[in-house]
Amino acid sequence: WNGASVWGGIFAPTIRYHEGVFYMITTNVTDKGNFLVHTTDPAGEWSDPIPIKQGGIDPSLYFEDGKCYLVSNPDNYITLCQINPKTGEQLTESKRIWIGTGGRFPEGPHIYKKDNWYYLLISEGGTEYGHKITIARSRYIDGPYEQNPANPILTHINRNMQSSPIQGVGHADIIQAPDESWWTVFLAFRPQSDMHHLLGRETLLAPVRWDKNAWPVINGDGSVSLEMDVPTLPQQPFATKPVRTNFKNGKLGLEWVHVRNPHPENYTFD
């Protein structure tokens, strides 16, 4: 990966857990293809990459009744098919199930099932200042999908940098915590002077509730802030990161994982 473009490498990995196995699926943008890997121990060895036929970016998996569904966005349509997650074989024809609400680049799809509804969550607008999260639902996994009349359910399109330091919110996933509370994780950036955001895309967390019409509502009004009231989660202090690493146990910590090959001139070993 030396010399790889900033637009290269892998995009938008999604991890799912099913029947004792962790699956991670993603897009290799450099080689123009999707693949998945799996393991029973996410801190251990993973399988070799398994190529996936259906194109597009931001693939995601959904498991139900012994079937594995793949959703991605070839040709800017959210598209569904069944696959064999162990071999990557595509078992059904790809079917277009939603094109979004009209924003450009409908992508980042995820499917969930709650109270006999299939929910399809996507991002639109591109990972820039027009980014937004929209959602649709259906009684059937392959549609037809009806969109939420309150879309977008999260965006900062209408908030400038003076009113909100968080911009470009999108590419979300929804999870349920062990205490049955609901949450969304998503990306955003924090621009500084001249609209530069040197930290790049950051990961944020916000609470979710379900309204009387069974649609998800993010942080009460579809916007987020740097500090949000989340009383259901206990405080989790972060341990101080070591400035010196001892290699006696033969294992490297996660801080040694790099997006690309490290620059050896930045490190000293003695």
Briefly describe each language-model feature range.
Residues 1-270:
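Carbohydrate-active catalytic/glycan-binding domains of CAZyme proteins
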